[in-house]
């Protein structure tokens, strides 16, 4: 009985030490030139004021789900960014704490979607997803966690709106 107890204790200690000392904390590499790295609240405000739709990824370098979803966000930016119409931004919550606090971001990753500078975009097809947070008006405000399907659905819907708006005379 004592041997099993000590083996379990040693395993738990190993997991604890591994999590503290061996977690990758290096900066998450950004592979897209279409993603704005926000370094100040003023920089984000300027982007929100100059662009119709903005998708913002609030992340932390130490967050494994943030690392997992980063290439997806970069690929979406490469495929759908449109100057003045649809922009993509990343905010490191450890470096720009004011911005994370301003938008009530407490979990990483969190993706907040803006239309004309305000959180919330009109997107269908996401009903019932626990990761999606909507406003009282039914607008998608944010996606909590690395929910690839929800993030892709929102971005592709916004991209379709941009293309549709450009096609109108």
PLM region descriptions:
Residues 38-39, 58, 69-98:
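Thiol-based oxidoreductase modules, predominantly thioredoxin-like and allied folds used
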Residues 102-106:
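A short glycine-leucine-enriched loop at secondary-structure breakpoints
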Residues 37, 54-57, 87-92, 110-114, ...:
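Beta-strand cores of modular interaction/reader domains in eukaryotic scaffold and signaling proteins
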Residues 35-53, 97:
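A short beta-strand-turn-helix
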Residues 107, 112-169:
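Non-catalytic, surface beta->alpha helical segment in thiol-disulfide oxidoreductase systems
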Residues 49-63:
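Short active-site neighborhood of thiol/selenol oxidoreductases, capturing the structured segment around
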Residues 1-33:
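N-terminal targeting signals for export/organelle localization
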Residues 63-66, 111:
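The canonical Cys-X-X-Cys-His
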């Amino acid at each position: 009985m004592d041997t099993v107890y000590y083996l379990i204790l040693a395993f738990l200690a190993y997991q604890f030490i591994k999590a503290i000392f061996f977690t990758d904390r290096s900066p998450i590499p950004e592979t897209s030139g279409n993603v704005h790295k926000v370094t100040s609240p003023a920089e984000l405000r300027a982007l929100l004021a100059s662009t119709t739709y903005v998708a913002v990824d609030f992340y932390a370098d130490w967050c494994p789900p943030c690392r997992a979803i980063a290439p997806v966000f970069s690929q979406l930016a490469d495929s759908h960014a449109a100057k003045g119409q649809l922009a993509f931004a990343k905010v490191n919550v450890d470096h720009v704490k004011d911005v994370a606090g301003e938008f009530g971001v407490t979990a990483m990753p969190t993706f907040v979607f803006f239309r004309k500078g305000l959180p919330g975009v009109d997107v269908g097809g996401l009903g019932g997803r626990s990761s999606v947070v909507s406003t009282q008006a039914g607008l998608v405000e944010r996606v909590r966690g690395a929910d690839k399907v929800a993030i892709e659905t929102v971005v592709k819907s916004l991209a379709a709106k941009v293309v549709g708006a450009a096609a109108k005379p």
